[in-house]
Design a protein with these regions (language model features):
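Bacterial Sec-dependent N-terminal signal peptides
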Residues: 1-22
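Hydrophobic alpha-helical membrane-insertion segments
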Residues: 11, 39-40, 132
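Active-site nucleophile/metal-coordination loop of metallo-enzymes that catalyze phosphate/sulfate
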Residues: 20, 34-115
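Boundary/entry segment of secreted carbohydrate-active catalytic domains
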Residues: 23-28, 36
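Active-site-proximal beta-strand/loop segments in catalytic clefts of secreted hydrolases
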Residues: 27-32, 59-61, 84, 122-127
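Short charge-dense sequence patches
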Residues: 28, 52-63, 166-176
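His/Asp/Glu-rich, glycine-adjacent segments
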Residues: 82-185
Length: 185
């Protein structure tokens, strides 16, 4: 099994970076090896990282160990969002998703704090919010995400299918624009 590295960028307390309010930004980039991001030294990511932190996250688990996990999107996202492996969070693929909501996501942890925190998600896939995070489900205490931009994979009018799935680039561009606008507010 090929080792897969997912890029995880965490920025904590970015005072004055894009907005007047301190913000934590957690970015998951699927399918782009961290060494490529580092080799290209992408300006936007490293500008943010210079004022916060940058780190790699390995989402495949230990090969041959109890934590070994397939490197499929939903599994990896849930590994990162819950800080647990598949054997606990129960997301074993990209379909027939049945998360174990006893393992809280970073969104639920933020919302359950005594201090009020605003949350946002910018994603191509609605299931990241409605299923993996469990927005509105009784099992997640009816978790509510404050700012939502997702579901672009279902919008075939704005993002018609292109050869070699190049419409995904258009969707990613829109998500990036939405996120940048939201962070600046």
């Amino acid at each position: 099994m090929r080792r897969f590295y997912s890029l995880l960028l965490m920025v904590l307390c970015c005072t004055g970076l894009f907005a007047k309010t301190k913000k934590a930004v957690y970015i998951i980039i699927d399918g782009v090896p961290a060494d490529q991001i580092e080799r290209l030294h992408t300006p936007a990511i490293f500008d943010i990282a210079s004022r916060g932190a940058y780190g790699r996250a390995y989402t495949g688990g230990e090969i041959g160990g109890y934590s070994q996990t397939a490197t499929i999107s939903a599994i990896g996202y849930t590994n990162l969002l819950t800080s647990t492996w598949f054997n606990k969070h129960n997301v074993g693929g990209n379909s027939d998703l049945k998360p174990n909501y006893n393992y809280w996501t970073i969104f639920r942890i933020a919302k359950e704090q005594p201090k009020e925190y605003k949350t946002a998600i910018y994603s191509s896939w609605t299931d990241n919010r409605t299923v993996l995070i469990g927005e509105g489900k009784k099992e997640t205490n009816n978790l509510k995400i404050d700012y939502v931009k997702d579901g672009y994979d279902l919008d075939t009018v704005r993002f018609p299918k292109k050869e070699k799935d190049l419409h995904i680039f258009d969707i990613d561009e829109q998500i990036s624009k939405d996120a940048a606008e939201g962070i600046r507010k």
